[in-house]
């Protein structure tokens, strides 16, 4: 192939013609087709973060709790007593849109490899899923496929799926989001990194044989979805959880035996990405012999060997002098183990095939993709929606019926039909089962501690105000951890956005990153890593439809004593309900802006996103933790989608008890805003000793309100005298509305 024809075909490699010219200029000669394909993969958004990395400078990434920050396979935080938690979230959006079962399954497999590549034993998975219209046959196909894929891989490998979130909105109709978060435990001394070490070190391929599945996956995930994407099924990998289990055990045994100097998962862009990233971290060069790569298909050529994304494969670099011991250990697990190359004292990435050099590129060139800082401009339509006057929105006549309607919305309704497909008790570390509390809680065996994890984002907030919406996602994650008794430690993020070449999309990305950064600083939760998934949009007629911007936040925290925790279910009649974060000087929730209620009942996505007071957010976290750790409450629940009334109903449904609540809001507050508005930094707790709880909150300077009490009668009663509201709905009706919707979608 001539140099001109390569330039003409730059787009097939994932490069613009300008990027191709830059590549040639930096290389100082014309590349061959393999070299162009390798650079295309490494400069893709999926691998090179060329539209997003310049924004990451805003993130706080350090702190005394951070053992490993961004740049490795996963972040690691210190939880005390010599223990660390490795955690990370990644997306498998495009593959899941094309082949939902394998797309989701391999998403689980890939994130688990990132965790055990750090020397940590995976012990939990959470998934954050976004789908389109729940009544659509395509949505039902995608939901069932994705859930089956996650269940298949997680259940088979023996790692519990312990939590997550599921959202339904038309913007995800053709482009679902599958974000998977994994956590693993490790001793500090077992922390591993992805480096080549020193000159002379061997490069060892271990795991499954290489096939043609996943070819072009990195480039496929860095472009818009279209009707032609359905033909890209070969770009979707095929997973084998039983092979991954062998690879997991072998890798951890090798690390703990002190045989490994460096370890890296083969993920996006396969063999190339994993090895050139390791070389770049070490500031060294490598030479590899592609003839030695184990294959499962006949006639594979260098481009396929380099860019295949076949699953369950790792690169290990032995400690010098322990090469044979490593080979013997890995062979015991019946894995393919082959030395395919060596670390050398130069700066080149060299590949040979049949005795000839077929690739010779600077390591830095591969790893330093061009970076773009684009101009972001807010969409005029979105600004108009945010500034819309909502005073004319009619007040529903039957607010009890509205509560039932909100509880039956698939985004709010019970996710039991989903999580009951997952084995959430395998490994026997799960202390709080999915749906029982605002975050997952896992025990650390041999220690009194527990680890909590959550994933959160309200895409509607981010659509209307990306800065406030992203900051709100961080604050909500922190509240959710506090509601189980965990101190928030750090986050991983999964930034899902549309095409960054569109100014209105780049604006959303810019603003969301800044919102995350500011919230993380305020709440002392550094960013330890994450994932960016752009080009999440599809064509509908003559229009490009982007997803709602979805910066999903995965957050971990620690419980000093896992037996001192809280859940959301009401536990006894006669307890007092307190609303933490209620600001008497500012009144009750006084807006229906950006609420699930406004969208569901009135068909509007409009209005101001409730402002995020980060000082109050920290006080609510501190106050919730203080009450739980003082033994003053074991019941706590965050107010989120659906507002105060939905949160109270969820607590009653979970506990099988009723409640009587009276809200003393002034007459100027709309009844629907009072019940269903989504003001931030609010947590409901149930306490036996209201005086002691109040004294503790006063000591902390945290505002609160007394809502009412729990009762035996199976009925939720909410009165608001100034609004002439007296809502009373029996528990059975609430429970039916909440439990049934997803049963009709799954099956």
Curated annotation (Swiss-Prot):
Gene Ontology MF term list: ATP binding; magnesium ion binding; phosphoribosylformylglycinamidine synthase activity
Active site: 46, 92
UniProt catalytic activity: N(2)-formyl-N(1)-(5-phospho-beta-D-ribosyl)glycinamide + L-glutamine + ATP + H2O = 2-formamido-N(1)-(5-O-phospho-beta-D-ribosyl)acetamidine + L-glutamate + ADP + phosphate + H(+)
Residues reported in the UniProt entry to bind substrate: 91-94, 113, 237, 309-311, 533
BP GO terms, sorted: 'de novo' IMP biosynthetic process; purine nucleotide biosynthetic process
Annotated residues for binding of ATP: 49, 88, 493, 530
Keyword Ligase tagged: yes
The UniProt record lists the keyword Cell inner membrane: no
Subcellular compartments: Cytoplasm
Protein residues bound to Mg(2+) 1: 90, 531
Keywords tagged on the record: ATP-binding, Cytoplasm, Ligase, Magnesium, Metal-binding, Nucleotide-binding, Purine biosynthesis
Family named by the database record: Belongs to the FGAMS family.
Record's protein name: Phosphoribosylformylglycinamidine synthase subunit PurL
Species this protein is from: Deinococcus radiodurans (strain ATCC 13939 / DSM 20539 / JCM 16871 / CCUG 27074 / LMG 4051 / NBRC 15346 / NCIMB 9279 / VKM B-1422 / R1)
């Amino acid at each position: 192939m001539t140099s001109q024809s390569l330039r003409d075909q730059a787009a097939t490699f994932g490069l613009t013609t300008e990027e191709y010219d830059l590549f040639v200029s930096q290389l100082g000669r014309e590349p061959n087709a393999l070299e162009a394909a390798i650079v295309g993969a490494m400069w893709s958004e999926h691998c090179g973060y060329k539209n997003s990395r310049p924004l990451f400078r805003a993130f706080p990434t350090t702190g005394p709790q951070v053992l490993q920050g961004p740049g490795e396979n996963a972040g690691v935080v210190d939880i005390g007593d010599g223990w660390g938690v490795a955690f990370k979230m990644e997306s498998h959006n495009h593959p899941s849109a094309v082949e939902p079962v394998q797309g989701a399954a391999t998403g689980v497999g890939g994130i688990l490899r990132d965790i055990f590549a750090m020397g940590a034993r995976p012990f939990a998975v959470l998934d954050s899923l976004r789908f389109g219209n729940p009544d659509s046959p395509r949505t039902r196909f995608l939901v069932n496929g994705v859930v089956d894929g996650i269940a298949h891989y997680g259940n088979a490998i023996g790692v519990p799926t312990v939590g997550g979130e599921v959202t339904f909105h038309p913007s995800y109709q053709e482009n679902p989001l599958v974000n998977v978060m994994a956590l693993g435990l490790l001793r500090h001394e077992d922390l591993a990194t992805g480096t080549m070490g020193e000159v002379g070190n061997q490069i060892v391929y271990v795991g499954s044989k290489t096939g043609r599945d996943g070819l072009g996956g990195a480039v496929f995930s860095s472009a818009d979805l279209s009707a032609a994407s359905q033909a890209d099924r070969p770009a979707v990998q095929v997973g084998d959880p039983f092979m991954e289990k062998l690879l997991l055990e072998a890798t951890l045994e090798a690390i703990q035996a002190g045989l490994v100097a460096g370890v890296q998962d083969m993920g996006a862009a396969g063999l190339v990405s994993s090895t050139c990233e390791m070389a770049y971290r070490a500031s060294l060069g490598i030479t590899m012999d592609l003839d030695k790569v184990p294959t499962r298909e006949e006639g594979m050529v260098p481009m396929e060997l380099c860019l295949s994304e076949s699953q369950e494969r790792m690169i290990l670099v032995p400690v010098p002098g322990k090469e044979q011991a490593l080979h013997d250990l890995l062979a015991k697990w019946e894995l393919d183990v082959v030395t395919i190359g060596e670390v050398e004292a130069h700066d080149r990435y060299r590949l040979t095939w049949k005795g000839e050099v077929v690739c010779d590129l600077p390591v830095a060139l591969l790893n330093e993709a061009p970076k773009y800082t684009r101009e972001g401009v807010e969409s005029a339509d979105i600004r108009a929606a945010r500034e819309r006057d909502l005073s004319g929105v009619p007040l529903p006549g039957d607010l009890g019926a509205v509560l039932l309607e909100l509880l039956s919305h698939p985004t709010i309704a019970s996710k039991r039909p989903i999580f009951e497909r997952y084995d959430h008790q395998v490994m026997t570390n799960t202390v709080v089962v999915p749906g029982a509390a605002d975050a997952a809680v896992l025990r650390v065996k041999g220690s009194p501690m527990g680890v909590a994890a959550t994933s959160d984002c309200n895409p509607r907030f981010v659509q209307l105000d990306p800065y406030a919406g992203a900051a709100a996602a961080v604050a909500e994650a922190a509240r959710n951890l506090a509601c189980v008794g965990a101190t928030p430690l750090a986050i991983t993020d999964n930034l899902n956005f549309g095409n960054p070449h569109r100014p209105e999309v780049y604006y959303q990305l810019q603003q969301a990153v800044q919102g995350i950064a500011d919230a993380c600083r305020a709440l002392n939760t550094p960013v330890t890593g994450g994932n960016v998934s752009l080009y999440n949009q599809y064509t509908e007629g003559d229009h490009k439809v982007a997803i709602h911007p979805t910066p999903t936040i995965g957050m971990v925290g620690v419980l000093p004593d896992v037996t001192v925790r809280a859940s959301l279910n009401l536990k006894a009649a006669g307890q007092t309900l307190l609303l933490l974060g209620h600001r008497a000087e500012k009144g009750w929730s006084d807006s229906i802006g950006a609420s699930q209620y406004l969208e569901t009942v009135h068909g509007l996505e409009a209005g101001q996103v409730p402002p995020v007071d980060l000082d109050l957010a920290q006080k609510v976290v501190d106050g919730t933790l203080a009450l739980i750790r003082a033994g003053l409450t074991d019941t706590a629940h965050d107010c989120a989608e659906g507002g105060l009334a939905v949160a109270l109903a969820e607590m009653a449904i979970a506990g099988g008890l009723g409640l009587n609540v009276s809200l003393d809001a002034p007459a100027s507050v709309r009844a629907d805003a009072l019940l269903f508005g989504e003001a931030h930094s609010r947590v409901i707790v149930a306490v036996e000793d209201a005086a002691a709880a109040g004294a503790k909150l006063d000591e902390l300077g945290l505002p609160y309100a007394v809502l009412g009490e729990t009762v035996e009668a199976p009925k939720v009663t909410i009165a608001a005298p100034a609004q002439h509201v007296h809502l009373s709905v029996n528990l059975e009706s609430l429970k039916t509305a909440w439990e049934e919707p997803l049963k009709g979608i799954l099956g």
